[in-house]
C-alpha cells in the first residue's frame, strides 16, 4: 500500500473510531490504539504535506455533535493537547519551551492530573450558570445545560464577588471509582446496561436526553482552565484556578507548581505511584507553562498549544487476540475460564492471560476463541477482558465450551444451583459457577485447600508456602489437611527446601497450630463464600463448632450479614459426608479449639418469636405484622392452629389469609417447628421485646490498635478484642472507648490524647486481657 492509500485508510478508520466514541458512546478501540493510528497519520502527512486536507482528523479535535442536542459554537476553540509518552518526549517539550521563550532560569509549570472523563464548558453571565456544552469537535459542541445543572459540585451561582460579566470555565466531568462501582451494581440489580469503565459511565450519563437520569448518576466536575473571559482574572494558570476555587468552583487537590522539567518528571513519578489509591481514574498528567504572558508568547500550532502537554501513563487498555480459553480449578472446585492471549504490553507489563470469571461473563461479552478483545490492567488487579471488537472477528472464531470432565482429575463438572426462598416457597436456579465434584481427590482442589488451610489468616503454619505444599501433595505425603498432622521428620527432611533445621521448625509450627481460635478454624476449612469476617460472625454468635455444624440455613440467616445463599453454602458444606470426615480427622489429631462456649448473649437475646415469624417470608407479613400476630397468639403452636377468626383479630384480612395459607402447607409447618426447636435448643428464649445484649464485657465499645505490638500481632489483638464484644476500628474519633498503642504509634495516639480517649500500652493491654480470662 502506497502512502496516499494508507493515509486515506487511516483517515477512514479514525473517522469511524471518532463516530463510535463521540456519537455512539461506544468506543471500539483503547486510547493507546487510537493514538498509534493518529500518530502514524500525522507522520505520513508530515512526510507528504501535499496530501493534507482540511477534513483530515489531524486538522480537527474530535467528532460531530449528537443531533439530538442543539449545537453550541465555542467562541474560543476547545483544543486538545499534544501527548508525551516517554520521559524523552517531555524533555523535548521542555527544550522547545525554553527555546521559544529565550529566558534565563527554570520555566515555572503547573502540574495536575489528567482526569479520565468528558471535557465540558460552563458559561457564567453575571455569576449565573447559563450554559453547559461538550467539547464536540473543538469548535462546535452540544448544549447540555440542563444536565450540567444536575452535577452537584457545579455551582449554579458563583460565590464571593469580583467575577467578570462573562466567564467561561472549562473542566472535566468524571465519575469516581466508588461512584462507578455503585452505579454498575445498581444497573446490574435492575437488569440494565453496565458500563465498561468510569469514563464511559460519565460520558453516557452526561449526554442523556432526560436530565433526570443524569441527576441520578454520581457525576463530579473539576476545573482545569477558562475560555472566553470579559476581563482579566489573573496572570498565571495556577492563579486563575485559585481564583475559580474562591468563587466556588472545584479544582484538583493535586495541583502543584514545578520549576523546570525535572520537577515535572518528579511530579509525574509521584502521582504515578499513587495512581491506584486516588479516588478517580486518571490517564496521565497535564503540564502547562504557568505564566499567561509566556503562554501568549509561545502561542499555538495546528490543533494544540505550544505551552501545554499531556504526559500519558502507560496504557491500561490494549488490543490483543484470544488464542484459547483454558479452565482452572480452584479451592472450592470452581472451574474458572482463563483467556490465553497473544502477549501484549499493558501498563508497562507483558500480559498473556486474563480472567473471564465464569461462563455468564463469557456470554455477556459474546466472546469466542480467535476474537480481538480490549483488555484492561490497573495496578495489581488481574488483567480483565473488557470488550470484544466484533468488527475484527475472524470467520473461524470458535465458541467457548465448558468441559464436561475436570481438566485436572477427570471428575464430572456440574453447574451450581442457587436456592431462593420467597413467600414460603423455595426455588432453585442455575448459578454462574461450574464445579468439579472430585473434592480432595482432585489434585488442584487439594493443593489450593491446603494452601488456604495453612495461610497466615487461617491456621498460620509458617514454613509452608505454595511450592512446599505442591511438593508434599505431589510426593503423596498429604491427601487432606489432617495429613499435615501425621507428617514425620524423616518424610520431609531432604525434600527441596527442607534441611534438618527447617524440617524441625515446620513440624513445630504444625504442632503449634493445634490450638486455633474457633473463627480461624472455621475460616481454614475453606467453606465457599465464607471469608474471615463471616467466620468470625459464626464463631462469635454460635459459640461452638457443633452449633455451626448443626445450624439450619434459616437459623444462619439470623446472624449479621449472612444471607440465604451463603447460609445454604454453609449448611451444605457441613451436610457433606466427605467434609464431615475431614473435620472428624482434624479433631482426632488433637485439635483444641479455643474460645468455644455458650451462644453469644447478644444473639440469644435478640431473637424473638415475632422475628422468627417475620423471617418465614409469609406474603404481606413483615416485622410489624409479626409483632401484632405474636401479641395476640403468643406461641408457634397457637399460630399454626389458629383459624381465620383468630388471625383476623390480630391482622388485616389479607395478612390473616396469607398466614392461614402458609401454615396449611405441612412442609411450612415442619420448617417453622424445626427452626423454633433449634433456636430453643441453642439457648434462645422467646421474648416479645428485644433485650439489650449482655454478657460480653466490651459490647458496644469501639477500640483502636496503633503502633507495633511485640507480644502478639495486631490481627491476634483484634481477635481478642472482638471475642470480648468490641468493635475494632481503623481511626480514632470521639466515639472511641480505648486506644492500644505500641511502639511507633503516631497520629492515632496524638488524636487520642487530643480527644481525651483512654490509652493502654501493650503491657497494660496484656494485663487487661488476663483480667478478662483471655490467654496470650
Curated annotation (Swiss-Prot):
Residues 693-776 form the BRCT domain. One of its GO terms (cellular component) is cytosol. It comes from the Bacteria. The active site is at residue 114. NCBIfam families: dnlj, PRK07956.1. PANTHER family: CHROMOSOME TRANSMISSION FIDELITY FACTOR 18, DNA LIGASE. This is DNA ligase. It comes from Pseudomonas putida (strain W619). The gene is ligA.
Amino acid at each position: 500500500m502506497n502512502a496516499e492509500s494508507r493515509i486515506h485508510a487511516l483517515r477512514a478508520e479514525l473517522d469511524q473510531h471518532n463516530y463510535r466514541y463521540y456519537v455512539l458512546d461506544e468506543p471500539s478501540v483503547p486510547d493507546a490504539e487510537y493514538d498509534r493510528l493518529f500518530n502514524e497519520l500525522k507522520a505520513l502527512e508530515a512526510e507528504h504535506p501535499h496530501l493534507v486536507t482540511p477534513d483530515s482528523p489531524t486538522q480537527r479535535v474530535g467528532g460531530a455533535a449528537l443531533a439530538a442536542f442543539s449545537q453550541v459554537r465555542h467562541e474560543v476553540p476547545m483544543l486538545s493537547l499534544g501527548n508525551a509518552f516517554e520521559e524523552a518526549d517531555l524533555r523535548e517539550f521542555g527544550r522547545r519551551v525554553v527555546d521559544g521563550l529565550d529566558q534565563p532560569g527554570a520555566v515555572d509549570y503547573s502540574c495536575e492530573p489528567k482526569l479520565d472523563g468528558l471535557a465540558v464548558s460552563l458559561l457564567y453571565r453575571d455569576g449565573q450558570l447559563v450554559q453547559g456544552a461538550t467539547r464536540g469537535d473543538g469548535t462546535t459542541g452540544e448544549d447540555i445545560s440542563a444536565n450540567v445543572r444536575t452535577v452537584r459540585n457545579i455551582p449554579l451561582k458563583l460565590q464571593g464577588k469580583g467575577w467578570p460579566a462573562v466567564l467561561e470555565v472549562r473542566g472535566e466531568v468524571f465519575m469516581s471509582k466508588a461512584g462507578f462501582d455503585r452505579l454498575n451494581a445498581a444497573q446490574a440489580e435492575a437488569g440494565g446496561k453496565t458500563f465498561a469503565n468510569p469514563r464511559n459511565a460519565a460520558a453516557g450519563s452526561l449526554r442523556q436526553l432526560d436530565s433526570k437520569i443524569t441527576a441520578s448518576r454520581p457525576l463530579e466536575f473539576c476545573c482545569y482552565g477558562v475560555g472566553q473571559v470579559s476581563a482579566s482574572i489573573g496572570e498565571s494558570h495556577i492563579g486563575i484556578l485559585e481564583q475559580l476555587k474562591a468563587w466556588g468552583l472545584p479544582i484538583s487537590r493535586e495541583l502543584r507548581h514545578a520549576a523546570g522539567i525535572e520537577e515535572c518528571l518528579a511530579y509525574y513519578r509521584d502521582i504515578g505511584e499513587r495512581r491506584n489509591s486516588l479516588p478517580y481514574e486518571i490517564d496521565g498528567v497535564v503540564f502547562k507553562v504557568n505564566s499567561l504572558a509566556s503562554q501568549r508568547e509561545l502561542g499555538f500550532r495546528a490543533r494544540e498549544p505550544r505551552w501545554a502537554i499531556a504526559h500519558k501513563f502507560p496504557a491500561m487498555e490494549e488490543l490483543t487476540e484470544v488464542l484459547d480459553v483454558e479452565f482452572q480449578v480452584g479451592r472450592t472446585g470452581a472451574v474458572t475460564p482463563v483467556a490465553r492471549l497473544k502477549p501484549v504490553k499493558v501498563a508497562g507489563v507483558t500480559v498473556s492471560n486474563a480472567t473471564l470469571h465464569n461462563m455468564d461473563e463469557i456470554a455477556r461479552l459474546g466472546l469466542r476463541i480467535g476474537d480481538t478483545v480490549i483488555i484492561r490492567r490497573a495496578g495489581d488487579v488481574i488483567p480483565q477482558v473488557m470488550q470484544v471488537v466484533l468488527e475484527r472477528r475472524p470467520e473461524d472464531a470458535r465458541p467457548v465450551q465448558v468441559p464436561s470432565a475436570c481438566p485436572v482429575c477427570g471428575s464430572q463438572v456440574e453447574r451450581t444451583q442457587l436456592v431462593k426462598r420467597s413467600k414460603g416457597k423455595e426455588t432453585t436456579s442455575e448459578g454462574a459457577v461450574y464445579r468439579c465434584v472430585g473434592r480432595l481427590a482432585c489434585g488442584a482442589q487439594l493443593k489450593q485447600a491446603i494452601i488456604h488451610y495453612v495461610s497466615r489468616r487461617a491456621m498460620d503454619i509458617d514454613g509452608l508456602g505454595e511450592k512446599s505444599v505442591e511438593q508434599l501433595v505431589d510426593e503423596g505425603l498429604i491427601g487432606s489437611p489432617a495429613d499435615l498432622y501425621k507428617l514425620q521428620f524423616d518424610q520431609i527432611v531432604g525434600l527441596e527446601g527442607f534441611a534438618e533445621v527447617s524440617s524441625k521448625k515446620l513440624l513445630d509450627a504444625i504442632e503449634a497450630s493445634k490450638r486455633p481460635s474457633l473463627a480461624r478454624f472455621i475460616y481454614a476449612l475453606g467453606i465457599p463464600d465464607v471469608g474471615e469476617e463471616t467466620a468470625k460472625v459464626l464463631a462469635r454468635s454460635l459459640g461452638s463448632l457443633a452449633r455451626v455444624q448443626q445450624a439450619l440455613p434459616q437459623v444462619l440467616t439470623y446472624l449479621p450479614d449472612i444471607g440465604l445463599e451463603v447460609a445454604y453454602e454453609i449448611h451444605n458444606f457441613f451436610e457433606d459426608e466427605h467434609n464431615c470426615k475431614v473435620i472428624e480427622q482434624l479433631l482426632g489429631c488433637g485439635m483444641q479449639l479455643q474460645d468455644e462456649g455458650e451462644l453469644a448473649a447478644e444473639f440469644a437475646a435478640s431473637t424473638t418469636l415475632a422475628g422468627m415469624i417475620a423471617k418465614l417470608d409469609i406474603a404481606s407479613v413483615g416485622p410489624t405484622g409479626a409483632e401484632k400476630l405474636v401479641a395476640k397468639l403468643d406461641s408457634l403452636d397457637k399460630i399454626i392452629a389458629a383459624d381465620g377468626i383468630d388471625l383476623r383479630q390480630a391482622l388485616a384480612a389479607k395478612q390473616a389469609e396469607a398466614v392461614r395459607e402458609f401454615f396449611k402447607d405441612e412442609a411450612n409447618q415442619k420448617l417453622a417447628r424445626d427452626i423454633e426447636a433449634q433456636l430453643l435448643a441453642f439457648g434462645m428464649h422467646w421474648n416479645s421485646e428485644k433485650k439489650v445484649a449482655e454478657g460480653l464485657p466490651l459490647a458496644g465499645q469501639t477500640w483502636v490498635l496503633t503502633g507495633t505490638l511485640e507480644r502478639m500481632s495486631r490481627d491476634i489483638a483484634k481477635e481478642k478484642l472482638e471475642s470480648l464484644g468490641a468493635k475494632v476500628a481503623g481511626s480514632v474519633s470521639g466515639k472511641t472507648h480505648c486506644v492500644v498503642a505500641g511502639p511507633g504509634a503516631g497520629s492515632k495516639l496524638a488524636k487520642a490524647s487530643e480527644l481525651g480517649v483512654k490509652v493502654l500500652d501493650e503491657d497494660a493491654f496484656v494485663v487487661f486481657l488476663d483480667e478478662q480470662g483471655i490467654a496470650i
